[in-house]
Amino acid sequence: MLARELQIFLLNKPGEMRMKTLSIIIPTYNTLKIYFQKCLLSLLCEQQNEIEIIIVDDGSQEQYSGEIKREIENSLLDIKYYKKKNGGQNSAREYGLAHATGKYVFFMDADDYVDSNALDRIISLLKKHKPIILAFNYDVRTPDGNIIEEHNRWKGEYKKVNVTRGLLYSDSLWLQIYDRDVFCKSGIHLVQGVRIGEDMATATAFLATIGTEYSTDECLYHYIKHPGSALSNPPEESALDMLQAFEAMLKQLDISVQTKYYAEFEWLAILHILYYNTMRVLTNYRGNVEYIKAIEVWMNENFPNWRENSYLKTESIAKKWMFVLIKNGHTKLLFDLEEAKKKIKIILGIVSRKTIK
């Protein structure tokens, strides 16, 4: 792999100083070396001279910081490294954004990786078309690289996106590449202070404010799903973080923007708060009644007519039986069914072990 790095370095020997096309900002916090290595190696591409990489160590323990710095020292990539006091992922992204110099900015997670060939083609699209926001496709993989889900939302090499549709799919900052100058001057801030929902709150607010987006069918991003993620094991203090994130998003938006995209914001609340947040409570906090009640009260206060939302009729996820139970207030029944399912799995496991013996 070192030979590959050297080959690309020689193809892109530094010339005169100029603005690079893309700044890639990667926050890291106690990231395992094996993930970080794969992340960095995936950024090797033929247009390496168009990229700067900004690593922001968000207060990692020294053993992890040391491994990260050694990986950076052994790389021929153009990398800037900063270490700061722990403040959360968006705090680290904001720090990196302040040090970025590229025309565009791309927020990555340190345990994910990209397709280097797709990255080359996307850089070419950015230089040719100069969009403010460019969305792309992605997949979800195991740490071993096996594909779990494929999300091919966008068709065509380069197309204008209907913003109402774009809002439905802007729940992560790493799903889009942004014009850095427009992003910084938009008045939209990276939402902080929550563990869950900060991506959705920021990305959605920015798209709604700017009102323009383009897409490509390139599958650029490989999202790694592993047991250590915040969404897999959310701490109990984050149980209602999504409500706070949503409120932070709405506070950043003009009333005219909220009115224009009311149906989309209402649907996002139904999806992320009523459904996903309720499922997290059922799965991780044993169906805590107070949390469930808080979610129901929030929905009815902020979107009193949510049951009439048009997306409930058109989005496929709204047809799932778990979604229907939650929508109709049958969370206790769903919790009992989930608990029964767990017990059945345990019983089947015991029977299986006895059969093997």
What do the predicted segments below correspond to?
Residues T21-S23, S42, E52, A201:
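Cell-envelope/extracellular polymer assembly enzymes that use nucleotide-activated donors
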Residues K84-A100:
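Glycine-rich, basic loop-to-helix element that forms the pyrophosphate-binding segment
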Residues V105:
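Short aromatic/hydrophobic "clamp" motif used to bind/position activated sugar donors
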